[in-house]
A protein has these predicted regions:
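Active-site loop-to-helix "anion-binding N-cap" substructures in soluble metabolic enzymes
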Residues: 1-250
Length: 250
């Protein structure tokens, strides 16, 4: 039985002062079978560690550089993230692919180094509106998955997380329908099966991301291949994020 994962990606939001206010109003009632994760900016990780260390909530990072140390100005290593208590690291988010030009090869290195350091990569995949219109969704997503998993042992693939985030839905307010999201997530599971076998496909958790909120989370989680959500804007207010978590546990 795959555990539901409700993950918040704060992106470049929340100063330390704003994060402190968030956590002071963040009162989680743990629900069985549902895991909560918060991925704040790097600057908020020490504070996040302080507030969440004695709770069931996990925390992670939005990025990593795939080297141990060195002359990589402005970057952060997997060991540094591990030292701050991170359990997860987001890899391959479309904003980093598009704005910062991260390649499939570079993302694969991140996925590999995160796994090697005992953390769980959340691999983001998704298609543009044009690719969707042209019927290229499966081609794009299969390519991203195969590239990202090249350095991962087949026996370890099932412990990863893949987040399907259609680029056209991120921050737009227009989520994919639950049925459309399920069709793509089912394809992702089949792709994982082709790469790493039936057990990996059965074990791997697949999230949907893109304008998820408390009003639609239950619809997504009714689908058999959707195991949670990667949430942006709705994770920035404790009452909104907690509402999503509550509905995920029903």
């Amino acid at each position: 039985m795959r555990q539901i994962l409700i993950a918040g990606n704060w992106k470049m939001n929340c100063t330390v002062e704003e994060a402190e206010t968030f956590f002071k109003h963040f009162k989680l009632q743990k629900k069985e079978g549902v895991e909560m994760l918060i991925c704040p900016p790097f600057t908020d990780l020490p504070l996040t560690n302080f507030f969440l260390a004695r709770t069931s909530v996990r925390w992670g990072a939005q990025n990593v550089y795939p080297e141990e140390k060195g002359a990589f100005t402005g970057e952060i290593s997997p060991a540094m993230l591990k030292g701050l208590g991170c359990s997860y690291v987001i890899c391959g988010h479309s904003e980093r692919r598009e704005i910062l030009g991260e390649s499939d090869e570079f993302i694969a290195r991140k996925v590999k180094t995160v796994k090697e350091h005992g953390m769980t990569p959340i691999l983001c995949v998704g298609e543009t509106a044009e690719e969707r219109k042209n019927g290229q969704t499966e081609e794009r997503i299969a390519s991203e998955i195969r590239s990202a998993l090249w350095g991962i042992d087949k026996k370890d693939v099932g412990s990863l997380v893949i987040a399907y985030e259609p680029i056209w839905a991120i921050g737009s307010g227009a989520a994919a329908t639950a049925e459309d999201a399920e069709a793509v997530c089912a394809f992702i599971r089949e792709t994982v099966k082709d790469i790493a076998g039936k057990k990996a496909a059965s074990d791997i958790r697949i999230l949907y991301g893109g304008s998820v909120k408390s009003e639609n989370i239950a619809d997504f989680l009714k689908e058999k291949d959707i195991d949670g959500a990667l949430i942006g804007g709705a994770s920035l207010k404790p009452e909104d994020f907690l509402s999503i978590y509550e509905k995920a546990g029903k």
